[in-house]
């Protein structure tokens, strides 16, 4: 009883504050204030997540010898995934996987509404997974967390649909800006990946969130960079062919990553009713890979740093420490290649068996190793002019981010801001463009948008498609119709027509299944001929509808049917053919115009 009273008291205080805000602070001003709060809270969430990961890893691996492998690598990931699955099953009780896809889905179909637990659940779950060695990234969970913070603040302050999308975008951009200390990358990530349109009205709140998150991350975590890089070999024009080829290689690696990830997800989906089988199967795959290739442990950023800081094979060879390859410098290229091509299996096994994490970091790691792999092979076999391995490691990361996310600006600015390698802008652009052109031949959507695009639930920059995505067919279905039976005499049909408010009457059987339709405009020439009343029944006068809409049909398909038939109304039926209502062309276009106006408004 006390808990209920306390909850009602808190709710009342919030309600009074919201009423006060509506009276004294404009929604525009409140949006800017919330943008600052979102940036602050996103940086706090990032700090806690990385704190959880660091403390768990320190606890588990502090006694390891850096030059030898350890059998505990076989055990840690399985323990972490098991603990994560227990946390999700008994505490969260909801699906929190595919963080960025979940944000896109909320924007497209749920009025940007995310559940309250998303403000913290992904932080804890992914912290446990990564800390115990799960081969996934923390970025997607943080993006989901930041977006959920923005969404829930928007719900509390009763913001309209467009402002809700903006606040979700603020949370996502703040998350990326805070994680990488890269405000511009956070801004363009929201534009390219979440596909939030940037007008002058929305630019300022997102910038505020990005800058706030970056500043507080510096306060919480210091000014150290995620990657240690010093440019010693500036870009030269004669390396352009190698950059183009690297971009093509990154595009193909992106395709490999996306297709393999999708295949692995399907494999684990077949075991959804056998959670312990998933845990054992995925855990064994992951732990075996980490045991053989320790660079797959956790996020893997430390391994990339070894490649960036090294100047020769002896220094680069440190990436093989704690593995069976340790001390065998001649196997470096083989080791790098194995990590490049097996990281996707480690990531899929982590998430598929019950872990929680994203594909952002794996994309960076695969890109870094792929870039080094390409450059090392190029130099060893003297394919052309010398290319610096460190530079190509960075460019590989940008290329994979571009290919996997279809986000060239994110790839360029993220790597430039992360490393301070602004002098590499030209080769970064060449690699990213080549990567995007290559992956676009095979996939038209990013790894996050692919699933939603197939279901027609993806909000894009294309205003027409975006409007159709935002339209809810259920809200368009009209129930105001006058049904009749097929054996009704024409004499009584005239009486039924006089009671109807529409130009049509659906003909139904006893179960409500649609048999046909009486179009009043088509029988007007005989309707007043009383001598025909006893000679005709409804089943002789009814017509088949020009098209029928399924109740789960996508709005773009509905619009195509209206265009093909030129009908004023079309019936909506369920899987058994039972009539659920009608959709009017006039109402569809009216709602469509309102949504387009909202999207286009500054």
Which residues does each PLM region occupy?
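Alpha-helical transmembrane segments and immediately membrane-proximal extracytoplasmic
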Residues: 1-470, 474-475, 479-480, 484-505, ...
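Phosphate-coordinating loops and pocket residues in cytosolic domains that bind phosphorylated ligands
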Residues: 205, 478, 525-529, 543, ...
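ATP/adenylate-binding site constellation spanning eukaryotic-like Ser/Thr protein kinases
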Residues: 209, 431, 478, 520, ...
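Structural signal for short hydrophobic segments within the conserved structured cores
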Residues: 480-484, 540, 545-548
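The conserved cystathionine-beta-synthase
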Residues: 484-501, 508, 527-530, 534, ...
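Short hydrophobic beta-strand motif reused across regulatory alpha/beta modules
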Residues: 515-523, 582-589
């Amino acid at each position: 009883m006390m808990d209920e009273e306390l909850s009602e008291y808190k709710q009342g205080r919030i309600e009074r504050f919201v009423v006060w805000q509506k009276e004294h602070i404009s929604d525009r001003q409140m949006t800017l204030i919330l943008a600052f709060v979102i940036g602050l809270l996103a940086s706090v969430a990032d700090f806690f997540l990385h704190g959880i990961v660091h403390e768990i890893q320190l606890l588990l691996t502090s006694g390891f010898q850096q030059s030898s492998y350890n059998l505990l690598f076989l055990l840690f990931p399985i323990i972490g995934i098991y603990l994560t699955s227990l946390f999700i099953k008994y505490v969260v009780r909801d699906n929190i996987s595919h963080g960025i896809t979940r944000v896109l889905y909320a924007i497209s179909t749920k009025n940007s509404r995310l559940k309250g637990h998303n403000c913290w659940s992904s932080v804890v779950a992914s912290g446990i997974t990564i800390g115990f060695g799960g081969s996934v990234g923390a970025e997607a969970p943080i993006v989901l967390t930041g977006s959920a913070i923005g969404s829930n603040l928007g719900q509390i302050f009763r913001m309209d649909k467009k402002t809700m999308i903006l606040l979700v975008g603020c949370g996502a951009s703040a998350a990326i800006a805070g994680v990488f200390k890269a405000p511009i990358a956070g801004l363009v990530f929201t534009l390219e990946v979440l596909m939030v349109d940037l007008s002058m009205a929305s630019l300022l709140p997102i910038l505020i969130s990005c800058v706030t998150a970056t500043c507080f991350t510096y306060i919480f975590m210091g000014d150290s960079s995620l990657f240690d890089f010093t440019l010693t070999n500036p870009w030269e024009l004669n390396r352009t062919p190698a950059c183009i080829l690297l971009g093509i290689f990154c595009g193909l690696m992106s395709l490999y990553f996306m297709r393999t990830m999708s295949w692995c997800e399907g494999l684990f989906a077949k075991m959804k009713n056998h959670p312990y089988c998933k845990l054992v199967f995925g855990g064994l795959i992951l732990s075996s890979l980490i045991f053989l290739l320790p660079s797959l442990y956790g996020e893997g950023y430390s391994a990339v740093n070894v490649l960036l800081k090294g100047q020769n094979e002896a220094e680069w060879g440190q990436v093989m420490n704690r593995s069976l390859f340790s001390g065998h410098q001649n196997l470096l290229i083989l080791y790098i290649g194995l990590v490049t091509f097996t990281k996707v299996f480690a990531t899929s096994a982590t998430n598929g068996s019950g872990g929680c994490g994203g594909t952002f970091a794996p994309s960076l790691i695969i890109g870094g190793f792929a870039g080094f792999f390409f450059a090392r092979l190029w130099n060893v076999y003297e394919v052309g002019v010398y290319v610096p391995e460190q530079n190509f490691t960075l460019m590989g990361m940008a290329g994979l981010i571009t290919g996997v996310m279809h986000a060239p600006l994110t790839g360029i600015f993220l790597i430039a801001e992360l490393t301070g390698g602004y002098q590499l802008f030209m080769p970064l652009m060449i690699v990213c463009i080549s990567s995007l052109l290559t992956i676009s031949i095979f996939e038209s959507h990013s790894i996050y948008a692919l699933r939603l695009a197939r279901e027609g639930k993806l909000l894009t920059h294309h205003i027409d498609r975006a409007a159709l995505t935002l339209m809810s067919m259920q809200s368009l279905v009209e129930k105001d119709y006058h049904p009749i039976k097929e054996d009704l005499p024409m004499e009584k049909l005239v009486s039924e027509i006089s009671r109807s408010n529409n130009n049509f009457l659906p003909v139904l059987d006893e179960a409500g299944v649609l048999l046909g339709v009486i179009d009043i405009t088509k029988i007007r020439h005989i309707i007043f001929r009383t001598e025909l009343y006893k000679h005709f029944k409804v089943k002789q006068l009814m017509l088949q509808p020009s098209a029928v809409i399924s109740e789960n049909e996508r709005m773009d398909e509905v619009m195509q049917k209206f265009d093909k038939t030129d009908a004023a109304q079309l019936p909506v039926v369920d899987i058994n053919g039972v009539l659920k209502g009608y959709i009017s062309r006039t109402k569809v276009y009216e709602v469509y115009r309102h949504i387009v106006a909202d999207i286009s408004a500054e």
